[in-house]
Amino acid sequence: EEFISWYHEFHQIPELGFEEKETTELICEKLTGMGIHPLRLDPTGVTAYVGPHDAYTVGLRADIDGLRVSEDTDLPFQSKHPGKMHACGHDGHITGLLGAASILKKMEAELTVRVKLIFQPSEENTKGAKQIISQGILEDVDEVFGLHLFSDIKAGEISVEPGARMAQTDRFTITFIGKGGHAAKPHQCVDATVMAADFVMNVQTIVARELDPIEGAGVTVGSLKSGTQYN
């Protein structure tokens, strides 16, 4: 129940990448309460150690940032930050790592390895990992473990398999340039909206016709903006 209450706390304070000030403070507060000394990263994020000082070091990593998504769930622990939400489960990742820290601290005398807790900022914009590496956070780590919540797996179960587990992403932005005019005279215009709509439909043929069907892939157009007037 304590871990669930932590999850509710973090769910209410989602913050975007490298803006996780409140999240960082709350993580430090929880670790300090366990008797674990937190080290703040720059500009956000936290690391800490549990176990013997001069020992083989295992890193446990969780990401801590939220998404620019509005939450409308009416949950009692709904996001308090308008336009931001923990929609990718990083609140659960934080809670899981804090839970592991709590358990490991209680059995610290039995540990034969040192555990480094790594609360990584800014995973969603793909810049946080490089940031903590540049600060030397992984220099004293021999191996690292992480996880990701997955809604298709039943609560209380885990899924482990060799090789790649989840897909990597690339982002694209495309600008279609047309020629403005009036809807009553489309023959005098170059309609960029039609161009964009045609692209959205036909870009799916990359997956359907250009790639090996045995390989997993997907193309998503997440946002399309066009025009300012209805006519």
Question: What positions do the PLM features span?
Answer:
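Acidic/His- and Gly-rich active-site-bordering loop/insert found
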Residues: 1-86, 91, 95, 99-111
